[in-house]
Amino acid sequence: MSTHDPISDLITRIRNAQMRSKTKVSTPGSRMRENVLEVLKSEGYIRGYATVEHSSGRSEIEIELKYFDGEPVIREIERVSKPGRRVYASVKNLPRVNNGLGISVLSTPKGIMADHSARDANVGGEVLFTVF
């Protein structure tokens, strides 16, 4: 199935799986999704992920979700920049999520990274989504 917005699809799959207390969820594979998942893993929002190659040539990413005391670690995950309305931020205007308790994930010229990494690298970019 073709999707017009792979980031929104990924976010929705994660949110829906956590509402149903699933331990794993799968999504079609792509480099962009892997980069986003790498940021979520390094920030401690997911346990991990693995790419699975099928005999048909398609790849799929299996995401292992993270829970703490039976509650999902991700309380809120919300898309900011959408295909119809892109949202960009310079280093000075990078949003803080819940007073710094959450993160914004950005697509920058130096790759996909969390907001604090973008501040350290002194780059701005497209604000893909926020996580708390």
Swiss-Prot record:
Cysteines joined through disulfide linkages: none
Biological process per Gene Ontology, one example term: translation
Keyword set, alphabetical order: Ribonucleoprotein, Ribosomal protein, RNA-binding, rRNA-binding
GO molecular function: rRNA binding; structural constituent of ribosome
Lineage top rank: taxon: Bacteria
Listed GO CC annotations: cytosolic small ribosomal subunit
InterPro entries recorded: Ribosomal_uS8, Ribosomal_uS8_CS, Ribosomal_uS8_sf
Role played: One of the primary rRNA binding proteins, it binds directly to 16S rRNA central domain where it helps coordinate assembly of the platform of the 30S subunit.
Family per record: Belongs to the universal ribosomal protein uS8 family.
Subunit structure: Part of the 30S ribosomal subunit. Contacts proteins S5 and S12.
Protein name listed in UniProt: Small ribosomal subunit protein uS8
Species in which this protein is naturally found: Bradyrhizobium diazoefficiens (strain JCM 10833 / BCRC 13528 / IAM 13628 / NBRC 14792 / USDA 110)
Encoding gene per record: rpsH
